[in-house]
UniProtKB/Swiss-Prot annotation:
Region spans: Disordered: 567-602, 967-990, 1096-1125
GO cellular component terms attached to this protein's record: endoplasmic reticulum; membrane
Note: Present with 1080 molecules/cell in log phase SD medium.
TM regions (residue ranges): 37-57, 75-95, 124-144, 147-167, 184-204, 630-650, 664-684, 688-705, 710-730, 733-753, 767-787, 797-817
Protein name: Uncharacterized membrane protein YGL140C
Phosphotyrosine: residues carrying this PTM: 1191
Signal peptide region: none
Extracellular side of membrane: 58-74, 145-146, 205-629, 685-687, 731-732, 788-796
Membrane topology listed for this record: Multi-pass membrane protein
Keyword annotations from UniProtKB, A to Z: Membrane, Phosphoprotein, Transmembrane, Transmembrane helix
Biased composition (Basic and acidic residues): 969-982
Amino acid sequence: MSLKSKLTKIQKLWLYYFPCDRILAKRICKSTVNTTVAFIFCLIPKITAHLGAAPAMLPMISVIVHPGRRVGGTIHGAIYCITGLIFGLAYAIFGRFLAQRCLGSSWHELTEAQQHVLHYKRYEAGLAILAVFEVIMLFFHGWMRSVSHYYFGIVFPLFVVVHFAFMDPLNETAGTIAKAYSTPFYLGIAMSIFWNLVLFPEWGTTYLGNTTIDAMNELHKSIDYSINFFIAVDPHNSSQLYSRDPVSLGKLLKMKSLISSKVNNCRVVLHECIYEFTYAYVSPTKLKPIISTLENLTVFINGLVNTCQLEFILLARHDNKLRPDDVAALTLPKNKEISFANAEKLLKVIDKLHPVIYSLHRTMSECMYIAKLVLAHAFDVKVSRVHSCSMFKDGNFPTFSNNANNLPNDVDIQNKINDLKQALEECKAKFKSEMLSFDIDIMSPSDEMFLLSSFLLNFRQTADSTLVIMESVKDILVKRQIQEKKGWLRGKRLWFLVLTNYETFSIWLKGDRNSVTENDTLKGTFNGNTNGFAHDTVIRRPDYEENELLSQKVSSNKNIVKDDASLDLPMTSEPKGNSSSTSDTSSSPLTLTKTTTFGTNRTSRRQGRFSFMSMLISIDKFCEVSHPHFRFGFQVAIALMLASFPMFIPKTRQWYIDYRGTWIGFVCILCLEPSVGGTFWVFFLRAVGVIFGAAWGYLSYVAAVNQTNPYLETVITVFGAIPGFYYLLGTPYVKAAIIEIISIYIVMLAAILPSQDDILTSFAKRCLAVGYGGGVALIVQVFFFPLKAREQLNEEISFVCGCISEMELLYATGLEGEQVASSMSEEKYKKIEKISKSAKEALARATAYKGLTRQEPRLKGEYTELENVFTQVIFIQKQIIERIDTISLLRKQNGSAVIEEFNSVVYPYRRQMVGSISCLMRALQEAFINKTPLPQFLPSARIAHRRLINKVRQTLRIRYPGQISNLSDKARKPNEGDYADGKDEDDDDNEGLVMKMNRRGQANTTANPHEYVLKEKFLSWNASSAASEEIIEYIEELLNLTKILVGVNEFKYGFLSRPLYEDWAAEAVTGFDNFINGKSNPMNTRRNRTPFDGTSIISEGNESLQSTNSNESQISPDSTRSYEPECPVAYEKNDNPAALNLLRIASHKAGQNADGLPKTFRNRAFSITSTSGQLSSLSRHSTLGNADPNYLNDDDESSDDDLPLALKMVLSHMKEKKD
């Protein structure tokens, strides 16, 4: 191996473990230069004389307010730091003033040692006042850090000023203290801003344009790839219109998380721009509507990708050669409803609609490309960043160079908008005309139609969102052209966005991201880029958030209180002295006057009691909401007072000062976290940082040979600061890196500046500070109100389950049969959007907690296996929330025909399905939070959803009986077992779940059913049904994973402990003669060892969509052992039981000429078994309401091969026992 190849290998290995891009390298360079210059200023005596009594604060503040971020982030950090300095300095001077008053008039004449000897009591009282002020400051510091991590940039400088000022001698004046803790701080902040603007400036507005273009590139690519994947079923077809083959499913699924992070980063950078002065033609706020549209576009693209995933399952592409990333990405449960749909029908429809979809896709892709070009020109982004689409064979996309200043003049935006509108209308018309050519069987509600509707609705909404983007781009282009006509000098303006409206001011004051940690605040960048490193701390979700978002009882109670408070007693008689206006006062509320003394006193007492009770309720609510703030406030106060109590005791104060007690408190405050983290791991990292920094400072000082060579000393410190800034800016270990960098300069300056300590003593005292201060912080955080990551993980997963239940209830409208004007109001959608955002943040926290749990000590065995289960749980919850977002936005945009027109008929079925889902999710929520097993019985949402689909299909047949019968004559004859067999009502009507339809007025309905089912609202319901099937399937999988984590309650004894009828059915088949004569011996059934062994026993042959006996298992959520039948058939007394062929029953083989088992016996045997996943295709087909005999290949209806698979399994078990 040559030297060059070895170096290349070493370089790749280095970049793998320590990734670094160009932006990070520039930021490290800026920060290192800034801190080095600050250290050089401390070495110059003339500059040090102007810095006051604490010149070592200059390098420290240069690290805290570092320039290694964008301009907006630096200004943001500077504003927060200055705010903390001002209030901290004022608070410290006030506390010292009161302490000096206790010393009397001699406070400025005597030293602290003399005060200790001459005025001990006064000196002790003054230190007691300082201690009280210190405790109040520490509690406020912890409270503010717990309220919002944004405020860490304010309260940390406040702590530094107050803590260090209280350590200074009490005989120093207020002017000396103000100079010591203002000049170096303000100089360090000014230097950071200077180097941020001079050396590699990063303007947020320019970065905003680049980020928006990058996000639109990914969105554009995802749209093209997903549409190509869906309609290009046969990539080898010569009539294929695309020049590229479809990408793999794995790559398509990975794009969802990528586009989500890109769009979120756009919003973050937009909020960061409010701190900047921008000199440009167009204000950055012009991108706000585009970014909002991109967020909605992300939801529709996720819907497109999900439909591609369903199509992949339906077309059974697993029979073909799969790419490795396809196999890795397709981690789906086996019992997918879509796998039982008819692929031929879907392919037939796609083949018809292929040209229509392609035409709109091509126009939409071209408009997206033009929009990116215009935005790149408007915000001075290099045109080379814009990616064009080259997957169209007849595509003619223009390309431009970077110096194309006349770019907008070559593009007619309005013409492109008109083309897109026309293409959208043509797509709707052609789609309607093409679909009208099919028979009603294809148009009826089915899994194929659900899949197609989901794709078409998301596709159209994507085109509508592109149209909205084009309108916004047109306004930006017009604004840019107007400003350009004024010339370069007058055209550009200075934009400052912080005080433009209340929203930007609120963001500036409080921030807009609840998931920001203190590390992100110190780092100054909120894009979550940690270069592959895991977070060491996570922000904890406020306890009151769950009550605000998920507690329906609280909101209802508020309404009750409000209503009760507004009730007034009616007047029964007219008060004295008010003889006039009788008609007015007779109907008015009771008015109490001064003459009614008794009533006034009674009312005043009631009002007093009500006010007192209201005050108690408010206090109780405040304490409940502020519980985590109290907890961390007490933690900070206890830890810091344990670490620094000697500074407030007269006898130990001087000793504590000599041992650098301020360092102990400084290390202790940085080791305390209001977040959940690996406490021992974080303490270890920060201890290593302090020791390494102090050792590097010692090395630098020794290399300078006792300050004889300060140049070499400075150069060596640079090599120690570079890795520190790398860990500060490029990894989540921010506070460990801060302590390491500060320790380098603090240890050196303690020996360089006039003091009694040499360099070795300073190194030892710094190590003592991390051992004592960090140890105290560790003890307090472990034993005083500890937070455990594994408990927080369960809480977050439980919270997400509650969010899903609440979103499902908000998504459902009209569950009581009432008439609703809109199926999704704006208010409900805003609530769903808010809950969805909180749930996604909770999932991000759960992912971090999952990694942190490995660092915690555990006594219950290894955590590795449980971590894999939690990984799957988080993934499934994310998929559920993603699909609820999609269907909610689709319903808001298009409505729902079933809710708005059929709700009076189908609402009991909708209510049962929604209630089942909500019940399941609430049961999971309580199981996770309480760590209790699941109950024995849980409702089946899958069956409820199938019944809803069947009822909608039946309602359509009742609404249009004549048209459907005419269309059905051309089609095949329905199967005998089909649900849609012409009956007006099914068996569930006898249970009172469905209301009879009023036949009056329906006979006059002559509308074409094709016209109805092609309405946008009905397509929206079809699309939501496809997503609802997926949601139910994921919920069942989540239920199974929950059983692994918390277990499930099972009946150990009694009738429900095992399926007794299974033994009866087995004996009826194997020993019919003995069974008839009453000589049967009950067999001992074997119970499953684990509730998840279903996949091991269902292994009789390969899976096939055309097979009559499907072997895929469907695990019902009702119990861990038994499986609920999908289609139980009641026993009919009119059937003739004499048609049994005992020979065939005993042989288990289908005869050629003999009659088989009667249909009633087979159905009855199926209904009494406890396995639903092992059904014949006839039963599955009957449930779905499809009646295609060619598709099912059910040639012999009475064949013995149609016996339930569960019955065959029992027979196989019996043979094994005999063997």
